[in-house]
A protein has these predicted regions:
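Flexible, glycine/threonine- and acidic-rich loop/arm segments that mediate assembly and lattice contacts
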Residues: 2-315
Length: 315
């Protein structure tokens, strides 16, 4: 006896012009995925994506040379080579021939409807993954590769609970969660100052819903104004006026509510080995199968340009 493939969507389950898929993904509620939407989009060419970082030497006050002296040759410092593994993420759709053919309420094509729905879900999964505390997994024949996420990179300017611990700053070790404590303005100001001292110019504070409300209660430094030309994206924008410039306060539904990030988005990129795409899967019966897929990784161009207040209460 033949049987349906697992998770096939048929008429019993049902209740009720084509664009380039990559454009469809990026046009779906960009404010729902603030990190993915704000990070630079770049290209990866291998499953292990590599890049280089560098830093200026510390400024000194004794750079004085004797008149007519022979030049003293400065030592050159090599760049730092960093890497992150590309992660494959997918969503699949299986629709019976009958379900595609019957007259349906609210949609002409069940396949098109389900693909559009899965595209939104895939983008949300990607935002959740990028902003998580996952450590890189290089993978193998029986193990999926995983990208080192935001929480495994930011170490230079982190504020953790006393029993928390920083990661390795290279994407391959997550930071250790500590005992949760209330989010305070002094923690935020300390991290912003640390980022600025390290050379960063942060523009965004990314928080979950609970700590967005906590931040709104901070002293007179939090203001609100209309976005003007950006009103298509935001009817209003929260701004935190720090001693080192204004930062946009952005709530994120999919990042960890226990983490508050201070981000210089010039130093974060998402490197795509394979951009968002859709494939027809082999037809093995009376059903149509589709796979939506993306393969990408997080590029931390200099983690010292961002900061983290971790181990925050969420209720």
């Amino acid at each position: 006896t033949m049987a349906q493939p697992t998770n096939t969507f048929d008429t019993y389950d049902s209740v009720g012009e084509r664009e380039d898929l990559s454009d469809v993904i990026y046009s779906i509620s960009p404010t729902d995925t603030p990190f993915l939407s704000s990070a630079a989009k770049t290209q990866a060419t291998a499953v292990l994506h590599e890049w280089q970082t560098d830093a200026l030497a510390a400024a000194v006050t004794n750079n004085a040379v004797i008149e007519g002296d022979e030049a003293t040759l400065d030592a050159s410092v090599a760049t730092t080579r960093l890497s992150n593994s590309s992660q494959i993420m997918d969503k699949t759709v299986v629709i019976t021939g009958t379900q595609e053919s019957v007259d349906k309420a609210g949609r002409a094509s069940e396949i098109a409807y389900q693909i559009a729905k899965k595209a939104k879900e895939l983008k949300r999964d990607m935002e959740s993954t990028l902003t998580s505390n996952n450590a890189e997994v290089t993978g193998g024949s029986g193990t999926a590769r995983q990208l080192g996420a935001l929480g495994s990179w930011v170490v230079t300017n982190d504020d953790l609970a006393s029993d928390g611990a920083s990661g390795a700053g290279a994407g391959n070790a997550a930071h250790t969660n500590g005992t949760q404590r209330a989010f305070t303005e002094s923690q935020l100001k300390s991290v912003i100052k640390s980022v600025w001292n390290a050379g960063g110019d942060p523009s965004m504070i990314m928080v979950g819903p609970f700590n967005k409300q906590k931040l709104s209660g901070f002293t007179g430094n939090s203001t609100r104004f209309d976005a003007g030309a950006d009103a298509t994206l935001y009817t209003s924008v929260d701004v935190y006026a720090s001693d080192f410039g204004q930062l946009q306060v952005v709530p994120n539904r999919f990042s960890r509510d226990r983490d508050a990030y201070v981000l210089d988005m010039d130093y974060w990129g998402v490197a795509f080995l394979r951009d968002f795409s859709m494939h027809e899967l082999a037809k093995t019966g009376d059903s149509e199968k589709r796979q939506l897929l993306v393969e990408a990784t997080l590029e931390s161009r200099n983690e010292g340009a961002s900061g983290l207040v971790a181990d925050l209460t969420t209720s």
